[in-house]
Amino acid sequence: MSASDNSPQEAATPSYPTQGERIASGAKRDLLPTNYAPEQARILFVHAHPDDETSSTGATMAHYAQKGTEVYLITATRGELGEVIPPQLQHLEVGKPGCTDNGEALGEYRVGELNGALEALGVYHHFFLGQEPATAEGVPVLYRDSGMAWGPNGKPIANPVSSDSSLTAQPLEPQAQALVAAIHEIQPDVLVTYDADGGYGHPDHVRVYEIVKRALEILGDDEDRPLLTWGIEGEYDPKDTRVQAAIFGDGTAKRKAMEAHRTQITVLDDKTFEYSNKVPQKISAVETYRVLD
């Protein structure tokens, strides 16, 4: 869940789902297809911004990496519009004194943070959407963070001043084609991304879900189509009849990865973190998912 947030209006306290709080009876304990050995499998995670992979799925990524699974990550943007927590780095934040660009320097800095987080998680295969191998017809594209604002109900709304090069402003079809190209290259057995609501509603998270959905439509019955696709569970819904998976992952690796994302996340103690909005959240080693496909 990225802290990307250029808020032009007063809003209610931000609202986030609590991870791993409700586990359905009969929930799976594995994201892999039945009888798949972890050391022979590949999982592809598709996220919107640097830090999302850690806060939403970090314990799961570390869990499978430790089991010998090939874990891949595609990140859609570099998080150029994120808020910055450390005072000594706030010149990187768009709109703050000292910022002389449109978030490019922050994006570069966050790429470095992402590299540190992935090392903590034990993940060594990472690409950006729009860059090889995730390109449509081999044409590289840089997708920018769309940003967001907090609405009066504590839920995200679209950023009214997002750029034309932002992820949500660009057409969906080439983005989906780029993901298809990456899937052909990686050949994952399992794909993990957001559910339709984007987890907590960030416009870029919702777009990433739409990209994955369209990519699966394009793939159809192609032999490279992932056997299972999972969506990160947001608020638990007892009426949701889809298969749930609950992964009891590595909370220690997740916390260390969070510490790498210092512009976005403050780790308060072993069990608690917060974004720039100072809403305390649990560092959960349990991460739940619902089957999408």
What is each residue range found by the language model?
Residues 104, 196-199, 240-245:
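Active-site rim elements
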Residues 129-132, 193-197, 203, 233-234:
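Short, well-ordered beta-to-alpha junction loops that form the rim of enzyme active sites
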Residues 47-49, 202-205, 261:
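Histidine-centered active-site/metal-ligand motif
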Residues 2-186, 213-222:
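Active-site rim/loop-helix segments in enzyme catalytic domains that contact anionic ligands
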Residues 190:
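Short, Asp-centered acidic motifs that coordinate Mg2+ and/or phosphate
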Residues 53-56, 80-83, 196-203, 266:
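Active-site environment of divalent metal-dependent phosphoester hydrolases
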Residues 2-5, 10-36, 210-213, 217, ...:
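C-terminal regulatory/interaction regions
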Residues 218-240:
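Short, flexible loop segments at boundaries between secondary-structure elements
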